Curated annotation (Swiss-Prot):
GO BP, one annotated term: DNA-templated transcription
Annotated gene: rpoA
Region (Alpha C-terminal domain (alpha-CTD)) location: 246-332
Domain comment, as recorded: The N-terminal domain is essential for RNAP assembly and basal transcription, whereas the C-terminal domain is involved in interaction with transcriptional regulators and with upstream promoter elements.
Annotated protein name in UniProt: DNA-directed RNA polymerase subunit alpha
Disulfides per UniProt: none
Subunit-level organization: Homodimer. The RNAP catalytic core consists of 2 alpha, 1 beta, 1 beta' and 1 omega subunit. When a sigma factor is associated with the core the holoenzyme is formed, which can initiate transcription.
Annotated family: Belongs to the RNA polymerase alpha chain family.
Recorded GO MF terms: DNA binding; DNA-directed RNA polymerase activity; protein dimerization activity
Keywords carried by this UniProt record: DNA-directed RNA polymerase, Nucleotidyltransferase, Transcription, Transferase
CDD domains listed in its UniProt record: RNAP_alpha_NTD
Segments of this protein annotated with the region Alpha N-terminal domain (alpha-NTD): 1-232
Length: 332
């Protein structure tokens, strides 16, 4: 076997542990590749799998989560935590509003949620609340599709007045993956005994099959690595375009900064005609300019800050070709 030829692994075993958990075995892998691929797939599975989650709820008679409701054993914080445990699957849509209405005495579960034809609850036995004889629970919940984790604070309006009273915002974990572990054992091919065997065990919440989750994670990894496969062709193109990739703001004359006449004339006296010329100067260099004092320097720094620029920056390929010729025409 040639040194340059890598072994191509194959799936040798898919062991179904239960409806939500599966163990996948892949071999043979070159030495070290077991941990490389195992860690990459594990991270993608835990952080990048799309899923659905309840992100908002409204409960009749409840204005905020730090309260209780007569006839309901749990406080509102507990109910919101229980709602986060509902495994919802949307078919053909990215958002839906669902309702739940129950009267006690009863144990309210996810199976009591009123579903539409394209919405599925995977764990209908999941407990949401316990109602006594006088208890009643009417709530509306918003379910959306997303990826990763999103804290409630990210979705609360900055202005408190914009937040509707009674809207309870939940932290949302969209990932359908409950647990991922991997281990690397030794594998053998003919006389080679230094190879890896990768064993991945994955458990989901039931909204996606474990083997399907592994396929999606591998596809995501493959898509991300495609950019490196195409790297050679991009390098030459980048070199050709490098000279032209100059921020148009830097090509604007310093007159566009609307400086005082004194400051503008001082800069032009030092052959500083464009914003690109100016930002490459340091404060020390500008203070050496005749008739340009600290007040003018402060003015210059302020107008540059408004444009996201500052003094002392370094630019490649400056000045661009033809700029000085244009400058000569303007000043002639």
């Amino acid at each position: 076997m040639q040194v340059s030829n890598f072994l191509k692994p194959r799936i040798v075993d898919v062991q179904r542990i239960n409806d939500y958990a599966t163990k996948v075995t892949l071999e043979p892998l070159e030495r070290g590749f077991g941990h490389t691929l195992g860690n990459a797939l594990r991270r993608i599975l835990l952080s990048s799998m799309p899923g659905c989650a309840i992100i908002e709820a409204q409960i009749d008679g409840v204005l905020h989560e730090y309260t209780t409701k007569e006839g309901v054993q749990e406080d509102m914080t507990e109910i919101l935590l229980n709602l986060k445990g509902v495994a919802v699957k949307l078919h053909g849509r990215d958002e839906v509003t669902l309702n739940l209405s129950s009267k006690g005495p009863v144990t309210v579960t996810a199976g009591d949620i009123q579903l539409e034809h394209d919405v599925e609850v995977i764990n209908p036995e999941h407990v949401i609340a316990h109602l006594t004889k006088s208890g009643e629970l009417n709530l509306t919940m918003k379910v959306v599709r997303g990826r990763g984790y999103q804290s409630a604070s990210m979705r609360i309006p900055k202005e408190e007045d914009e937040r509707s009273i009674g809207h309870l915002i939940l932290d949302a974990s969209f990932s359908p993956i409950r647990r991922v572990t991997y281990e690397v054992d030794s594998a053998r091919v003919e006389q080679r005994t230094d190879l890896d065997k990768l064993i991945i065990e994955i458990e989901t919440n039931g909204t996606i099959a474990p083997d399907e989750a592994v396929r999606k994670a591998a596809t995501i990894l493959q898509d991300q690595l495609t950019a490196f496969v195409e790297l050679e062709g991009k390098i030459e193109t980048a070199k050709e375009k490098k000279a032209a990739e100059i921020d148009p703001v830097l090509l604007q004359p310093i007159d566009d900064l609307e400086l005082t006449v004194r400051s503008a004339n001082c800069l032009k006296a030092e052959n500083i005609y464009y914003i690109g010329d100016l930002i490459q100067k340091t404060e020390v260099e500008l203070l050496k300019t005749p008739n340009l004092g600290k007040k003018s320097l402060t003015e210059i720094k302020d107008v540059l800050t408004l444009r996201g620029l500052s003094l002392g920056m370094r630019l490649e390929n400056w000045p661009p070709a033809g700029l000085r010729e244009e400058e000569t025409k303007v000043t002639a």
